[in-house]
């Protein structure tokens, strides 16, 4: 089973370098578990993955050390302050969150279409950027900070997108909400990545994604 929004390969060596001193890392919204490919770039710690949709992990074979299936806002399997680091890529609140079923044969790059059925309640993959999306990510980040050790490292890969010709400030939201929850923002790395070449805004794409780096 394919996932419509796996990590771009260009991020993996960057993550591996940032995480090199961490004994373990959690990806709470792991999708297929591709984060485990940081081991190919020198990371030697334990990789723990969690996702609300259990089927994603069946689509690829990555060297994940431990899998969990739960809402990232309620990871009751994890202890307080259990993880040295968290590295994740939340949904971007873009048109990949469209939740209708296409019957006209056109290509649809959405979580719903790739998974093949309705998403689990609480999955941000059906949330367009707005109040529901923002409230849910605040809950998720509160839970992430609960399971992250004091002075632990938090890495968030996220991007703005274009809607009706306007750039939506998704990156700024994630930066602000984590700061409001008590995380210390350290720096942002902007990385040019290939973007989708079709769709309503195919001629207007944000050309970079951001890696936001925080300490608890």
Task: Please annotate each region the language model reported.
Residues 1-216:
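Class I S-adenosyl-L-methionine-dependent methyltransferase catalytic core
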């Amino acid at each position: 089973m394919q996932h419509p929004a796996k990590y771009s390969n260009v991020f993996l060596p960057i993550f591996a370098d940032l995480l090199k001193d961490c004994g373990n890392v959690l990806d709470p919204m792991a999708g297929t578990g591709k984060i485990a490919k940081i081991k190919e770039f020198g990371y030697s710690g334990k990789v723990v993955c969690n996702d609300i949709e259990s089927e994603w992990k069946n689509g690829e074979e990555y060297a994940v050390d431990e899998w969990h299936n739960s809402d990232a806002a309620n990871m009751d399997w994890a202890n307080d302050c259990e993880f040295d680091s968290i590295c994740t890529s939340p949904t971007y609140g873009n048109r990949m969150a469209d939740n209708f079923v296409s019957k006209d044969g056109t290509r649809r790059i959405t979580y719903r279409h790739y998974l093949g059925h309705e998403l689990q309640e609480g999955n941000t993959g059906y949330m367009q950027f707005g109040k529901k999306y923002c409230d849910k990510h605040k809950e998720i980040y509160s839970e992430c900070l609960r399971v992250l050790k004091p002075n632990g490292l938090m890495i968030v890969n996220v991007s703005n997108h274009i809607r009706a010709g306007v750039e939506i400030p998704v990156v700024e939201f994630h930066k602000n909400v984590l700061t409001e929850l008590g995380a210390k923002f350290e720096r942002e790395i902007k990385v040019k990545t290939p973007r989708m070449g079709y769709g309503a805004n195919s001629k207007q794409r944000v050309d970079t994604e951001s890696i936001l780096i925080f300490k608890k």
